[in-house]
Amino acid sequence: CTFVGLVRDMGGPGATGEEIRGMTLEHYPGMTEKALQTIDTEAQARWPLEATLIIHRYGRLEPGDQVVLVAAASGHREAAFEACHFLIDWLKTKAPFWKLEDSSSGGQWVDARDSDDAAAARWMHAGNKSSEAAE
């Protein structure tokens, strides 16, 4: 299973509807890599996976650019699909990235979205040994 996220040309839910000219993604080296490794390790513990991959770009990006790739390989398709969902859901809420969107009205730092928090929260009660042990 793979997922490639692209830079959108319009802001997400709650945005002004302005066209996005680009965005700058910032991260904290060391801290971000550690968070991504922790997310990867958690996925490996939850599902029977052969391999996982997380690649996240940073710096200046334009609409349509690829910004993130998550991948999971497993002998069981459901495990791979669930792991991909988990990887992107947790990455969006637990990895320290900061997004500055550039629109016609200037730059605006993007706040975390409630929908991203809700997507990540479902994995806290996923009914598998790893999530139950974390509770």
Task: Name the predicted role of every residue range.
Residues C1-V67, A73-G75, F81-H85, D89-E135:
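N-terminal, polar/charged subdomain of small-to-medium soluble alpha/beta proteins
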